[in-house]
């Protein structure tokens, strides 16, 4: 195992597919292994911990190797043409199994194989097989890495809202919560076959919403408004009024919005902690409902645009 002397604060390594499982029409579970994963780790719960995966270029099949990754690896990687280096995307660590050199990382990948959302991750996952190789960038034990946004205050009432792209994150969080936590999770998926078995605290209700032919996010919006029981129901958002990099947490705002140093008290929803992730337009609408209309304090919310309809995902 490496020491903390002269090593990168992140783990950059080649990994190999150990197994592939089709969980549902829209989800593929891939288990990744490498001896270097012995150095993977975070201090405390992983919750919605993010990592990076580099996929082969779908046209050429080329993929850069992590090799002896040094501090300039990312810069060197970016300088190469995409058709040679591969494509980097962000995923949630769904689970970690084993220990030492036998450590494996589980990632659930959404299959967007039609329309304008086809990407290198979906393309790769649809045909992935044991022995296939990727490059992984993840937390190294003993170093700050970031990538965990779920951070409720002690005793907060949870509200978790997700579309299919955030299902791995919600499920990972639910399985790591203290058994005394209470709240509600609303999860929208494309089909009834995408409803997965997830175990969380008995005090957290989990509602799966099947989109079917409904507009993207409509069932989520209606469920959240109904759950909160207050405020107007109309949260229509114009396409040109959406931050393509929407990412707002109690400590960060992608829009540069000033984040209050102190939180308001005495509000009807004081004690709520909302974690909302998915398509940026849907997330923007829900953000307006909670923050603008219901006046939920910014310290109580995390809004994350995991993707934007009609826009190619970036690394």
Predicted regions span which residues?
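Extended, composition-driven regions rather than compact fold-specific motifs
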Residues: 1-315
């Amino acid at each position: 195992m490496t020491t903390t002397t002269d090593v990168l604060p992140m783990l950059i390594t080649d990994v190999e597919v150990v197994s592939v499982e089709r969980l549902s029409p829209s989800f593929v579970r891939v288990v990744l292994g490498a001896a270097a994963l012995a150095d993977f780790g975070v201090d405390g719960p992983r919750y919605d911990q993010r990592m990076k995966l580099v996929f082969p270029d779908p046209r050429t099949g080329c993929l850069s190797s992590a090799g002896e990754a040094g501090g300039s690896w990312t810069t060197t990687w970016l300088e190469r043409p995409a058709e040679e280096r591969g494509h980097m995307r962000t995923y949630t660590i769904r689970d970690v199994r084993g220990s030492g050199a036998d450590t494996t990382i589980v990632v659930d990948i959404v299959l967007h194989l039609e329309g304008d959302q086809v990407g290198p991750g979906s393309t790769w996952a649809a045909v992935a097989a044991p022995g296939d190789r990727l490059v992984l960038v993840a937390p190294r034990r003993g170093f700050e890495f970031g990538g965990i946004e779920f951070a409720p205050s002690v005793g907060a009432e949870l509200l978790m809202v997700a579309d299919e792209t955030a299902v791995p994150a919600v499920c990972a969080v639910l399985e790591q919560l203290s058994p005394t936590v209470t709240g509600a999770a609303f999860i929208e998926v494309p089909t009834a076959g995408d409803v997965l078995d997830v175990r969380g605290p008995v005090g957290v209700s989990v509602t799966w919403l099947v989109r079917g032919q409904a507009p993207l996010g409509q069932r989520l919006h209606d469920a959240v408004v109904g759950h909160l029981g207050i405020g107007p129901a109309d949260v229509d958002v114009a396409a040109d009024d959406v931050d393509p990099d929407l990412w707002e947490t109690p400590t960060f705002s992608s829009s540069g919005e000033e984040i209050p140093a102190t939180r308001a008290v005495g509000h009807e929803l004081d004690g709520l902690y909302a974690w909302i992730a998915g398509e940026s337009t849907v997330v923007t609408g829900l953000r307006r409902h909670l923050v603008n209309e219901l006046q939920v304090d910014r310290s109580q919310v995390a809004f994350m645009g995991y993707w934007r309809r009609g826009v190619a995902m970036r690394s």
